[in-house]
């Protein structure tokens, strides 16, 4: 087996894994959205490390204005919003860290517009984040529990050491 393979379906409806040195690594899938004036939500899919202790802190620390959030989401679906490489190559955008968009490897994955929170929450990610009125709100989608509504969760304070 190759040391690094493409994403393998582990369970088609629940999660995907990546294998590094024959050991599975599980993705924590999430969706990052910004609420628009009419209540609709423009969002992008985020594949790796979507839990509040990592992604929530990255969003609050580095994507904390409407302009920064809009720019992040405008790039479309991504592997990660905070990476020091772009698909294994050094960054050429002048940033030490930044998004790793699927479009950078030729995929067409633009942002998605949902008419309301109910539609936004119907995507089967494990966590969802909404930037609303200058603040981030995180939700545990209880992906692996039947019939459990999304639950608001706290984003831990403090920046991550990088």
Label each region the model flagged.
Residues 61-162:
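Low-complexity intrinsically disordered segments
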């Amino acid at each position: 087996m190759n040391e690094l393979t493409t994403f393998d379906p582990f369970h088609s409806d629940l999660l995907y894994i990546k294998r590094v040195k024959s050991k599975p690594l599980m993705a924590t899938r999430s969706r990052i959205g910004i609420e628009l004036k009419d209540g609709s939500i423009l969002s992008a899919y985020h594949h790796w490390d979507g839990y509040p202790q990592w992604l929530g802190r990255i969003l609050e620390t580095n994507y904390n204005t409407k302009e920064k959030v809009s720019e992040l989401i405008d790039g479309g679906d991504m592997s990660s919003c905070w990476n020091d490489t772009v698909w294994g190559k050094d960054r050429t955008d002048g940033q030490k860290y930044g998004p790793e968009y699927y479009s950078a490897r030729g995929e067409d994955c633009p942002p998605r517009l949902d008419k309301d929170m109910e539609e936004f929450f119907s995507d089967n990610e494990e966590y969802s984040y909404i930037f609303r009125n200058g603040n981030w709100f995180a939700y545990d989608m209880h992906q692996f529990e039947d019939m459990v509504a999304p639950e608001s969760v706290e984003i831990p304070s403090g920046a991550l050491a990088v």
